[in-house]
């Protein structure tokens, strides 16, 4: 018996929706990264995109534990001398709900063409509405609510 290697044309990408209300950022991000890669499937093949589409709603209501809402800092640089900007988690959530979750998931995916294709299958929305109802996404429950 030989090992099965998935072929891109044979892979079925399902759609899932996750409600991030009162869930912990890292726990949601790690589960989403696992499902975007397709490692939860028996046909997982490292060089083929076997993952599913993930829609995350209520990303504005995701939590972090402890004092990370003030201590966790996201940096970006404009390219000019002295052009570094630092924003903490609370301010980033207020200005761009869901971007912290996108950055966390992106950091857990492989870097390169396959990883870039995987991150495109992640759809994050700050509110409870999403435009993907035509795909009939299944509800995916994730453990790890903030205490």
Curated annotation (Swiss-Prot):
It comes from Verminephrobacter eiseniae (strain EF01-2). It comes from the Bacteria. Gene3D superfamilies: Ribosomal protein L13. This is Large ribosomal subunit protein uL13. InterPro entries: Ribosomal_uL13, Ribosomal_uL13_bac-type, Ribosomal_uL13_sf. Belongs to the universal ribosomal protein uL13 family. This protein is one of the early assembly proteins of the 50S ribosomal subunit, although it is not seen to bind rRNA by itself. It is important during the early stages of 50S assembly. GO terms for cellular component: cytosolic large ribosomal subunit.
